[in-house]
């Protein structure tokens, strides 16, 4: 079987470097999740607060 790539790269780094990479990846993940939730909330808020138009013809009149 193929060896685990993360383990191969980790073997070339010190414990402190590995911890630093792990923390950085964790905070990037938290940032991504936070932005996703924020954008979803903003879009949902805008969709709920905007009037719903049933068809483009009604929008013109």
From Swiss-Prot:
Q: Which residues lie on this side of the membrane: Cytoplasmic?
A: 44-61
Query: What is the predominant subcellular site recorded for this chain?
Result: mitochondrion
Q: Which Pfam families match?
A: Emr1
GO terms for cellular component: cytoplasmic side of mitochondrial outer membrane; mitochondrial outer membrane
Give the transmembrane ranges. 21-43
Q: Determine if Hydrolase is one of this entry's keywords.
A: no
Report, from the record, the phenotype seen after gene disruption.
Answer: Decreases the number of ER-mitochondria encounter structure (ERMES) foci in cells. Abnormal mitochondrial organization within cells, manifesting as fragmented or aggregated mitochondria, spherical mitochondria, or absence of mitochondria. Decreases the level of phosphatidylethanolamine (PE) in cells. Decreases growth on glucose (fermentable) and glycerol (non-fermentable) carbon sources. Simultaneous disruption of ept1, psd2 or psd3 leads to decreased growth on glucose carbon source.
For membrane topology, the record states: Single-pass type III membrane protein
**A GO BP annotation:** outer mitochondrial membrane organization
Q: Where in the cell is it found?
A: Mitochondrion outer membrane
| UniProt similarity note | Belongs to the EMR1 family.
Question: What function does this protein fulfil?
Answer: Mediates the formation of endoplasmic reticulum (ER)-mitochondria encounter structure (ERMES) foci, thereby contributing to the formation of ER-mitochondrial contact sites.
- Protein name per its UniProtKB record: ERMES regulator 1
Which organism does this sequence originate in? Schizosaccharomyces pombe (strain 972 / ATCC 24843) (Fission yeast)
What is the primary gene name for this protein?
emr1
